[in-house]
Design a protein with these regions (language model features):
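A broad, low-specificity signal for short, low-complexity segments enriched in glycine/proline
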Residues: 1-12, 45-47, 84-88, 161-165, ...
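Non-catalytic accessory segments flanking enzyme active sites
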Residues: 12-13, 18-20, 182-184
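Short, mixed-charge, low-aromatic patches
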Residues: 15-19, 121-129, 246, 250, ...
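Rieske [2Fe-2S] iron-sulfur-binding domain
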Residues: 3-7, 11, 20, 25-146, ...
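C-terminal catalytic domain of Rieske-type non-heme iron oxygenases
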Residues: 56, 134-349
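A general structural signal for short secondary-structure junctions and capping/turn motifs
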Residues: 15-16, 39, 115-117, 247-249, ...
C-alpha cells in the first residue's frame, strides 16, 4: 500500500505591492558632486540626482512634466537641471524656473522633489508612499568612527543589481544557521533584538576568511540600511571594521545592492601597511558577502517557510519588516516594545 505524502503549498504573495517606507542609501555622496545629473532607477520609477553649487544633493522625479523626457539625460546650468528635449530648466525643488521660448511658466510645471540626507559620507533618500516625512527618531545614525582619524574613511562600495525580492536579503538578519554551511563560520552565540524601526543581530563565531574570535553586532535602521561592526583576529592582528549592507528596490522583484567596508588603522603600522591590511580585509568581507549573493540570486520568496524548532525568529522578523509596508497609523503599538530572542548560545560559562 502506498502512503500519500501531504502536499505543502508554497505561498508567494506579492500583489498588491508597495515600496518600503524608510531611508534608502544611494552610495557615496561625493560621487554626485561632479556637475552632472545621475540616473536612479528605483521604487519602480526613474529619479535624477544632482548637486547644486552649495554642495547640496537634490533628488527629483526624472520625467519632465512637459513632454515626458528623461531629465537625467540633461545638463546642469547655474544650479538648474536643463531638460535635453526643450531646455526647460528646473530648480533644486523641482519647479520649472525658465522656459527659453516662453515668458509665462505654467503653474503645474514642476516635478516631485524627494527628501534626502547625508550621513557617514553617504547619501540617503526617503521613501514613503503616504508622502509624509520621517517621524522623530527615524534617522540614519551618525557613526562615531567617522569622527575618529584612526579609521580609514573609505567605504570601498561595490554595487550590483539582484533579481529577487528585497525581503530575501533582510531574512539573513535572523538566520543563525547559514553561517556554517555558507560561510564556514561556526556560530557560538546568536541573538536578535527588535525595537521600533531598528532590528539588531548579535553574532559571535570564528571565520575562515575574517579571523578567529569574530564578534559582529549589527542593526537594520529601517527596512534597507544595515551596519555591522566587526572585531576579529586577522592574521595575528586585531582588526576592527564596519560593514555597510544597503539596498534600494528597483521593482518588486529586484534591488540595487550596495556593499561597503571601512577599516580602522592598526596602531604601529605604516600607512602603506594599513592600506594593505584594509584591502585584504575588505576583500575577505566581500568574498564572504558574495557567498550570500550567490544564494539570493537563485532562490525564490516563500511566505510560509517550513521551519525547524531552532531556526530562529523568522516570522517575528517578517512581522517587524512588514511595518514598513503599511500606513504608519496602522503599525501595531507593540512594534515599539523591545523583543529579544536568543537562537544560539554555546559560550562557555
Amino acid at each position: 500500500m502506498m502512503t500519500k505524502l501531504a502536499e505543502i503549498k508554497v505561498e508567494n504573495v506579492l500583489e498588491p505591492y508597495r515600496y518600503a517606507r524608510g531611508w534608502h542609501c544611494l552610495g557615496d555622496a561625493d560621487q554626485y558632486r561632479d556637475g552632472k545629473p545621475h540616473t536612479l532607477n528605483v521604487f519602480g520609477t526613474r529619479l535624477v540626482a544632482f548637486a547644486t553649487s552649495d554642495g547640496k544633493i537634490n533628488v527629483l522625479d526624472a520625467y519632465c512634466p512637459h513632454m515626458g523626457a528623461d531629465l537625467s539625460q540633461g545638463t546642469i546650468e547655474n544650479d538648474r537641471l536643463v531638460c535635453a528635449f526643450h531646455h526647460w530648466k528646473f530648480d533644486a525643488a523641482g519647479k520649472c524656473a525658465e522656459i527659453p521660448y516662453c515668458k509665462r511658466i505654467p503653474p503645474k510645471a514642476k516635478t516631485k522633489s524627494w527628501l534626502t540626507c547625508e550621513e557617514n559620507n553617504l547619501l540617503f533618500v526617503w521613501n514613503n508612499p503616504e508622502g509624509k516625512p520621517p517621524r522623530e527618531g527615524v534617522v540614519i545614525p551618525h557613526l562615531p568612527e567617522m569622527d575618529d582619524d584612526s579609521w580609514i574613511h573609505n567605504w570601498n562600495i561595490d554595487i550590483m543589481e539582484i533579481d529577487t525580492n528585497p525581503r530575501e536579503l533582510v531574512d539573513n538578519l535572523v538566520d543563525a544557521h547559514h553561517f556554517g554551511p555558507v560561510h564556514g563560520t561556526p556560530t557560538t552565540y546568536f541573538a536578535n533584538i527588535f525595537e521600533g524601526h531598528i532590528g539588531h543581530q548579535i553574532f559571535h563565531g570564528d571565520s575562515e576568511r575574517l579571523g578567529g574570535g569574530l564578534v559582529a553586532p549589527s542593526a537594520y535602521y529601517g527596512p534597507a540600511t544595515h551596519f555591522t561592526r566587526i572585531s576579529s583576529n586577522f592574521g595575528g592582528v586585531e582588526i576592527h571594521a564596519i560593514l555597510l549592507n544597503s539596498h534600494v528596490p528597483v521593482t518588486p522583484n529586484s534591488f540595487v545592492l550596495r556593499f561597503g567596508c571601512m577599516v580602522k588603522r592598526v596602531e604601529g603600522f605604516t600607512e602603506e601597511q594599513n592600506n594593505e591590511i584594509a584591502k585584504g580585509y575588505v576583500t575577505g568581507n566581500r568574498e564572504s558577502f558574495y557567498q550570500d549573493v550567490a544564494i539570493w540570486k537563485n532562490k525564490i520568496r516563500i511566505d510560509n517557510p517550513v521551519l525547524a524548532e531552532t531556526d530562529g525568529p523568522v516570522y517575528q522578523l517578517r512581522e517587524w519588516y512588514q511595518q514598513f509596508f503599511m500606513d504608519e497609523d496602522k503599525v501595531p503599538a507593540s512594534m515599539a516594545e523591545r523583543r529579544e530572542i536568543v537562537t544560539v548560545d554555546l559560550r562557555k560559562s
